[in-house]
Amino acid sequence: MNETITNKLALLPDKPGCYLMKDRQGTIIYVGKAKVLKNRVRSYFTGSHDSKTQRLVGEICDFEYIVTSSNIEALILELTLIKKHDPKYNVLLKDDKTYPYIKITNERHPRLLITRKVKKDGAKYFGPYPNAGAATETKKLLDRLYPLRKCRKMPDSVCLYYHIGQCLAPCVYEVSEETNQTMVNEITKFLKNGHSDIKEQLRERMEKAAEDLDFERAKELRDTIAQMEKVMEKQKMAFADKTDRDVFGFSYDKGWMCVQVFFIRQGRLIERDVSIFPFYQEASEELLTFIARFYLEKNHIKPKEIFVAESVDKQLLKELLETRVTQPKRGQKKALLDLAEENAALALKEKFSLIERDEQRTVKAVERLGEAIGINAPYRIEAFDNSNIQGVDPVSAMVVFVNGVPQRKEYRKYKIKTVEGPDDYGSMREVVRRRYVRLLKEKRPLPDLIVIDGGAGQIAAAKEVIEDELGQAIPVCGLAKDDKHRTSQLLMGSPPVVVPLQRDSHEFYLLQRIQDEVHRFAITFHRQTRAKSFLQSALDDIPGVGEKRRKALLKTFGSVKKIKEASIEDLSKHVPTKLAETIHHTLNKNKPNA
């Protein structure tokens, strides 16, 4: 904990509000709320935490806080700040999953549509439905029963829907407002669980058609009734009062939370939504934020009633959402809440089991890799890759995998210092030397295996440093790629020979991940270096920008990149206008290719 944080912790007030955690670049990485700021913020820096919270705390270098006059103000402000800053440690609600609704448009001649967007346009919306198939089946049934207008724009003549009895053709014939309203009322009644009455009417019409010997019509009505029963089949969980409800069950363990939302529509459980995410506040506070964002940010329609556990601040949620909030204590409602919480607990347990299984599989892959190359299991693997274009701005990068898992905090970047021109072997010798001379000097653990992105020459260069210069016996292997730049072969030994590995094995997949990761890290660093080098040299070559002026500009703007992004007007405040124009045009006329 740095001095800045220590000093700020001593000044925290005993009031509600929001806090914004920042990393070393000043980027906001987490936003939270608190009933008592002093207690909540201090808790991050005292006592023990789960691994997720430890990771967050490890990145915090500073924080801000905003005092509010009430808890509800703190909650509203938290939602605003999360939306504005999009901090990486705040839970991300799913944007890509929206449920379908059936819509009756607010038009002179209404239409029946399926939509995933609910708007305040005067239309009637029914749902959500569990999936597009369920909504489509219901709409098809209603189209057969109620011939509302189908075309988006009125055609000049009747369409196919008129001929099959699914449209009254208001484009050609007069359809009264009363007729349209009657159909809208019937559809509304049907979708609000009045299908039993409508089914009875259809049954009477079917029997009448049979009595009149109109067997084709009777069969048609019989099929319609069967379709209705299929579409509107009652589910196990149903309520007699037909109230629309959302039930929020949650469970948490090991720094993770699962929230299951049960959608109850017209008294029936039609669908659930599952979210699993790491959390960093008190569990009840995290759930409160989740529910608020669920409705305020993601366009979910608020039902007439919400069920939540007793640990949630009922009054605060009620004030924020302006809807009825219930904490069931007995009976069918409590059973439904318990069911949601049980499902949440099971989903979380399943996630942990999958994580554990994946970890076991990864560790097993590490052990099998060791067996394949004839060494002990390489639990710590360090991989190197060089990157340059014809020897320009040469760099190298190293990644670390422990038990098959990337350790990104241990990754390292190297600018090549001693090698001139495109000398890949010389670059490899330099970075391997720099890495392991330092580890030996600092008495830090050496890897069990060194992986080189390259073939025989790169392997030999690395072994020359490890074995001949440093006298270490660390196994070194190389990864060769095919003509499509994909991991192709594992090379080992002196001279290197191909180690046979099944391409669909977990150990081969592990090597592929390592090679892809070190290449990604190296190429990203090289692009950054090239861009910086381009800007720096471009600034140095501008007439009128000498050493003194260059330093003054860098001090004012902070970096060459910021100078490049500055407008001519901003630059003119520090240099003559003509020179400002020259600087702006020179830095922006050419951009390095990625």
Swiss-Prot record:
Interacts with UvrB in an incision complex. Belongs to the UvrC family. Residues 196-231 form the UVR domain. It is found in: Cytoplasm. InterPro entries: GIY-YIG_endonuc, GIY-YIG_endonuc_sf, GIY-YIG_UvrC_Cho, RuvA_2-like, UVR_dom, UVR_dom_sf, UvrABC_protein_C, UvrC. GO terms for cellular component: cytoplasm; excinuclease repair complex. The lineage of its organism: Bacteria, Bacillati, Bacillota, Bacilli, Bacillales. It comes from the Bacteria. It holds the Pfam family UvrC_RNaseH. Keywords: Cytoplasm, DNA damage, DNA excision, DNA repair, Excision nuclease, SOS response. PROSITE patterns: GIY_YIG (PS50164), UVR (PS50151), UVRC (PS50165). Transmembrane segments: none annotated. GO terms for biological process: nucleotide-excision repair; SOS response. Residues 14-91 form the GIY-YIG domain. One of its GO terms (molecular function) is DNA binding. This is UvrABC system protein C. It comes from Shouchella clausii (strain KSM-K16).
